Amino acid sequence: MLSVRVAAAVVRALPRRAGLVSRNALGSSFIAARNFHASNTHLQKTGTAEMSSILEERILGADTSVDLEETGRVLSIGDGIARVHGLRNVQAEEMVEFSSGLKGMSLNLEPDNVGVVVFGNDKLIKEGDIVKRTGAIVDVPVGEELLGRVVDALGNAIDGKGPISSKTRRRVGLKAPGIIPRISVREPMQTGIKAVDSLVPIGRGQRELIIGDRQTGKTSIAIDTIINQKRFNDGSDEKKKLYCIYVAIGQKRSTVAQLVKRLTDADAMKYTIVVSATASDAAPLQYLAPYSGCSMGEYFRDNGKHALIIYDDLSKQAVAYRQMSLLLRRPPGREAYPGDVFYLHSRLLERAAKMNDAFGGGSLTALPVIETQAGDVSAYIPTNVISITDGQIFLETELFYKGIRPAINVGLSVSRVGSAAQTRAMKQVAGTMKLELAQYREVAAFAQFGSDLDAATQQLLSRGVRLTELLKQGQYSPMAIEEQVAVIYAGVRGYLDKLEPSKITKFENAFLSHVVSQHQALLGTIRADGKISEQSDAKLKEIVTNFLAGFEA
């Protein structure tokens, strides 16, 4: 009689939907019943009330927890897209796992099935395979443990140096900071490139687009900027340090390998994270890589530190997103891109920000790269990103092949907020340079048709040629801001107007060597003060005049 009552009590305690019961629940219930039978002799010797209490205690003490796992089955698979039936409660952008071990992300939530993009080779998945929810939105490891490492879009190490030891993880699709935590850009982000720091200055927390045709030096500007941060990161002042994240999207593996080698040779990898989703990787990984890199950069920003992230390039991310959207049968729009391609980039670039002191005072600066076709900046993706960012550096093929490198078009390049962050010393020497160069380009176009030019026009042309020569700079050779100030000072104050344009580069190299070796105190004063005082101006004038006399002799 007791056995029947025990069995009935156990059955009543179990959930009614047996299809959802795990083995753990059944096993633990049967163990409770077996334990009761084992102590049946003991129960017979006790009173009815005591026996009931022991029985109740045994049944209530049994582990009846139910581990529910929602699973579905693959209806169709192809082109990196899986249609899955049965995942009724899956979240948007939730990670799911296939029976082969491959991971995917749910993007399309439809009434009868879920569209899942696969992170890898879909040949490992077959129709009818079981798909399991993980309950986790896609996240990546973050933290200083990633510095010096090369990782994929999911944060897995691909540099052969072992797994990432970071214990902190962040979602890749976090919302951008609101209005209240932000503050206007006020600190300079030195690139070490004369043409950029003087004409299109960038501030910490800014979004500055680098745009141009292929093979015009877009990546070179980004890499030089990373290398230039070594002078700040070698110091102990955490406020001056700038941690760098380079996101390679759709590039060749050999290109990424060369880039990592270049950064290693320059001793810049120790403060850099490289996130790589190469051309051979699945489109979902190329789509995800910028968001993963941004989450890694936000870790530094939200901890009161400063970070720089380079997206090279967002054109390929847009192409990968277009591929995924068309395969998911989303309606195409202009140039076959989906309607939310603007939101694709705006929600990414809005995460770059300068935070106010109440929120740590950190910053995340973004340098997105966009590749144009035959200089067409009015195409869909370039115009979108231009409208989102705080300015652009426009690189021209024509200037590049003329030997003007970096091939920055001064007229089309602009920095909307960076001038507020430019150091006062650079403002003092470069204030009129952009106007002079713009006038020079305009006059140079008309000067081709006539030889009779007045003295003022000839002076403008002469100054423009020399300033253009002065702004040329070799690859992987960034300069300190005080060195740039000294060189540009000589050009804009007219000391080089009588020097042959072909000798400008030679003069610059010799002059820099002289100043660095003989007048380190003056450079230190400019660096510390952030401006050119009357004493510094007089000293600089004397140095340039004396050196030029010896150089021409």
Swiss-Prot record:
Its main location: mitochondrion. The modification Omega-N-methylarginine is found at residue 204. It comes from Pongo abelii (Sumatran orangutan). Keywords: Acetylation, ATP synthesis, ATP-binding, Cell membrane, CF(1), Glycoprotein, Hydrogen ion transport, Ion transport, Magnesium, Membrane, Metal-binding, Methylation, Mitochondrion, Mitochondrion inner membrane, Nucleotide-binding, Phosphoprotein, Transit peptide, Transport. It is a peripheral membrane protein. This is ATP synthase F(1) complex subunit alpha, mitochondrial. The keyword Chaperone does not apply. The record marks 413 as: Required for activity. Residues 1-43 form a transit peptide. The gene is ATP5F1A. It is found in: Mitochondrion inner membrane; Cell membrane. The modification N6-acetyllysine is found at residues 123, 126, 132, 161, 167, 230, 239-240, 261, 305, 427, 434, 498, 506, 531, 539, 541.
